[in-house]
Curated annotation (Swiss-Prot):
NCBIfam families: PRK05371.1-2. It comes from the Bacteria. It is found in: Cytoplasm. InterPro entries: AB_hydrolase_fold, Galactose-bd-like_sf, Pept_S15_Xpro, PepX_N_dom, PepX_N_dom_sf, Xaa-Pro-like_dom, Xaa-Pro_dipept_C. Belongs to the peptidase S15 family. It catalyses: Hydrolyzes Xaa-Pro-|- bonds to release unblocked, N-terminal dipeptides from substrates including Ala-Pro-|-p-nitroanilide and (sequentially) Tyr-Pro-|-Phe-Pro-|-Gly-Pro-|-Ile. GO terms for cellular component: cytoplasm. GO terms for molecular function: aminopeptidase activity; dipeptidyl-peptidase activity; serine-type peptidase activity. This is Xaa-Pro dipeptidyl-peptidase. The keyword Amino-acid biosynthesis does not apply. The active site is at residues 375, 495, 526. Disulfide bonds: none annotated. It comes from Lactiplantibacillus plantarum (strain ATCC BAA-793 / NCIMB 8826 / WCFS1). The lineage of its organism: Bacteria, Bacillati, Bacillota, Bacilli, Lactobacillales. Coiled coil: none annotated.
Length: 813
């Protein structure tokens, strides 16, 4: 294990002792202890909250080695001092590390340094130094990725604190909320928020079902903040309807009618519809009428339920027990998302049921809201933030879409999210329209939704792939300047579902917005990262939310790096940076000749290179069903490779030193095609034999992360180094040749005439090792993402015109 810990708050000795006293590790009876070993033994006893007898403690101490020759019990019997070797021998075992396997009893300090664990340098401790070392140990992450204080939490240490009076809750330790709330006593309510919408046109404002989990202490006056997850999947998914709506991608690319469109021609202009009157409450109450059993939860939310935060889930318009129609990303969906926040902050009404008009307020909420979630969930958090809604203090958006065009299209082409060939906005709407799963409701509402679905299918315009008003309405980047909430963005550099451009564009736009923003880039695909062993992500979010929602002064904004990136060359290695590419001035610039990428100052030959897109039918069918085989063959250099004549491949010289490629690679050149339409696709490749990180985090221990005491669990995971591979695709991009200048403007092209093109690839942050080669692949049909017409398209590129620009940072550590 290699520890990467960013959420530990630097603390002086006086503050540490005060905090230890607050959580009862230092108690008045310890004043009578006259020796440091006696104080140490008292601290050790408190670290075993599951043990209630002296004989039980002796048994536990007998299973811990203090030195290579003595158990902890034996050592305590004769100890006159506490030195750092014994302290960290014992401490490492309390943290779950094994002597002889994870560290050596003869030199625990070496392991502390190698694992990157914080420690005190004193060779021998007086009482004050012991307390400080113990405080630091409690805040040190163990082999299961949790701090020692979190480990004690899961074993019941904070159970006596459940009885604290409300004015002593929540309880913070080292700047983070602790689990002093009984999750067995959580209150579960259902309410129905009235949104300022009538999307199903039934003459009534849409009601939105909301599921609430809140601490029991709210019943006696404690007001708590909310973690709100807007999840269209929350009430169920109609997979069958989605599958039926999927589009055939084995269709030909066709010529578009040229146009003179400018952005003004496709800009979405919001309209104000006449709304039905709001419902009139007949009475008010503080008590919900409905409850629920097990919500579809996010484990990060589960963690905070034990720590003084309420959690709210809402699936929004078109979902079971709500009104409205699922619209996939439009303004109405944003409005429905924001309506929940407005109710939580007292600005909108909700009711205890769908028919009785009995109003209920969020009287238990302190008015501070954060939004959490990944993918569509994080997308709606981003959408809500761009409205500037009051009360939304922060969002933690993971793998979030910032523009739906960048999710389903690319430069005038239909480009699917990875593994979802044929999906589009209408498919997603059909899936999340869970009202269709309730027969009675579906009987009434299905005709209206079928009409809505037909509108989505028409307006998304798969025939052209162009950016239009439909997509402009679903572009949250237009309203980034309205954001008032502070933001943490999390994204996978290998996420080809929600591609990196989505987070990169949001991050770039936020540079001009006066909010605090943080960015975490990991090496995964479309995943959550709150269960990684090597990163204290959950503690980071605890630090952040304790500050943002409870107003705790814990230095969260300065302790967390602006940009935190997982290294792709080493396991369990993370680096902090001031920015992504925005502070970058260096770059690698290449021309091409024959099969090489050469430095831009080289003279290259005047010649053209050619490839054909059409494959033999049998091979085409094989690749459709074996996409990994297609990508592997695309990158093979062997002339017998079936794709050798179906793409161009250029490789740089070996890197003379490690290079950090960051930001947006850019390819320019000139191309001709034998038809009046065409497309180009591009990949950047890291060529070089190396052990690379696994595509997905591997389970290290199932259900090893306890999120509270007798509460929910999560698997402990992390990326590992896999077997050696010869190359890795690091980014890609696509271009419709009729959209060489703008995605909303289709230009005519003539067969066999060369046209200049210029295209940005997906942003990257990649460590290229010394001796590796950078590769550029130029091809047409992307079997994983574009439509696949398998047409007789012949492409020619002027090699002397091709340029590749890749921004880079100097590696300084």
């Amino acid at each position: 294990m290699k520890n990467n810990q960013f959420a530990i708050v630097p603390t002086d000795s006086e503050t540490a002792i005060a905090e230890l006293t607050k959580i009862h590790f230092i108690t008045p009876d310890m004043d009578a202890l006259t020796t440091v070993p006696a104080v140490y033994q008292a601290l050790l006893a408190k670290s075993l909250p599951e043990v209630h007898t002296a004989s039980g403690l002796t048994h536990k101490f007998n299973n811990i080695m203090a030195t290579s020759q003595h158990t902890l019990s034996e050592w305590l019997a004769d100890a006159t001092i506490v030195n750092n070797q014994v302290f960290y021998n014992v401490g490492l075992q309390l943290l779950g590390f094994l002597p002889g396997q994870d560290f050596e009893l003869a030199d625990p300090l070496l392991a502390m340094r190698d694992i990157h664990l914080p420690m005190v340098g004193d060779s021998a401790f007086d009482r004050e130094a012991l307390y400080y070392a113990w405080y630091l140990l409690l805040n040190t992450r163990g082999n299961n990725g949790q701090t020692l204080i979190e480990s004690l939490t899961t074993r019941g240490y904070f159970v006596p604190f459940y009885q604290l009076p409300n004015d002593q809750k929540p309880l913070f330790f080292n700047g983070k909320a602790q689990a002093v709330f009984d999750t067995n006593a959580l209150i579960r309510d259902v309410v129905y928020v009235e949104a300022p919408l009538d999307t199903d046109h039934d003459g009534q404002r849409d009601l939105l079902k909301v599921e609430i989990l809140r601490p029991a202490e709210t019943e006696t006056g404690l007001k708590v903040p909310v973690l709100y997850t807007a999840s269209p999947y929350n009430q169920g998914i109609n997979d069958q309807a989605g599958d039926a709506q999927m589009h055939n991608v084995d269709v030909p690319l066709t010529a578009k009618e040229p146009d003179e469109n400018t952005y003004a021609d496709v800009e979405f202009q919001p309209t104000t519809a006449q709304l039905p009157a709001a419902r009139t409450a007949t009475t008010t109450t503080d008590t919900a009428e409905e409850t629920f059993s097990r919500e579809k939860s996010y484990t990060l939310n589960d963690y905070f339920l034990a720590r003084g935060f309420a959690v709210v889930y809402a699936a929004g318009i078109g979902s079971i027990d709500s009104d409205g129609l699922a619209p996939t990303g439009d303004v109405d969906e944003t409005t429905s998302t924001v309506a929940i926040i407005e109710w939580l902050t007292g600005k909108r009404q909700a009711f205890t049921n769908r028919d009785g008009n009995i109003a209920i307020k969020a009287w238990w909420c302190n008015g501070a809201v954060a939004m959490t979630g990944r993918s569509y969930l994080g997308t709606l958090a981003t959408a809500a933030a761009t409205t500037g809604v009051a009360g939304l203090k922060t969002i933690i958006s993971e793998a979030a879409i910032s523009s739906w065009y960048d999710y389903y299209r690319d430069n005038g082409l239909v480009v699917a999210p990875d593994t979802f060939q044929g999906e589009d906005t209408d498919v997603l709407a059909a899936e999340v329209f869970s009202r269709s799963l309730k027969a009675g409701d579906a009987h009434q509402i299905q005709p209206a939704f079928d009409q809505k679905l037909a509108e989505l299918t028409a307006d998304q315009d798969r025939a052209s792939g162009n950016y239009n008003r439909f997509w402009d309405e679903r572009n949250y980047l237009k309203n980034v300047d309205k954001i008032k909430a502070d933001i943490i963005m999390v994204h996978g550099l290998n996420d080809w579902n929600v591609k990196p451009r989505n987070v990169a564009n949001l991050w770039d736009k936020l540079q001009a917005v006066p909010v605090t923003k943080k960015l975490i880039l990991h090496q995964g695909q479309h995943i959550y990262i709150n269960n990684l062993q090597s990163l204290d992500f959950t503690d980071m979010m605890n630090l952040w939310l304790s500050h943002k929602l409870y107003g705790l002064d814990n230095h969260a904004e300065t302790l967390l790096p602006n940009v935190l990136v997982q290294d792709n060359t080493q396991a369990q290695t993370w680096h902090g940076y001031d920015n992504w590419w925005q502070d970058t001035t260096d770059a690698l610039d290449f021309k091409v000749q024959y099969k090489e990428l050469v430095p831009a100052d080289h003279t290259v030959d005047q010649r053209a290179a050619h490839f054909t897109d059409k494959l033999p039918d049998k091979l085409f069918d094989h690749y459709k069903h074996h996409l990994d085989s297609w990508q592997r063959d695309l990158l093979q250099e062997d002339k017998l490779n079936p794709l050798y004549d179906h793409r161009l491949l250029f490789k740089s010289w070996q890197a003379p030193e490690d290079q950090l490629l960051v930001g947006i690679p850019h390819v320019a050149g000139s191309v001709a095609v034998n038809k009046n339409f065409g497309m180009l696709s591009f990949m950047l490749i890291d060529f070089g034999a190396a052990r690379r990180l696994t595509v997905s985090p591997q389970i290290l221990a199932a259900k090893a992360l306890d999120l509270g005491y007798h509460w929910r669990e999560d698997d402990l995971k992390d990326f590992k180094l896999a077997g050696e591979t010869p190359f890795k695709m690091i980014t890609k991009g696509h271009l419709n040749l009729q959209n060489r200048h703008h995605p909303w403007h289709a230009e005519a092209i003539q067969p066999n005439v060369f046209y200049d093109f210029s295209v940005d690839l997906q942003p990257l942050f990649h460590h290229l090792l010394k001796g590796h080669q950078l590769g550029l692949v130029i091809y047409a049909t992307d079997m994983k993402m574009t439509i696949r017409g398998n047409q007789d398209l012949q492409y020619s590129l002027n090699l002397n015109d091709i340029r590749l620009h890749v921004p880079m940072k100097k590696i300084t550590d």
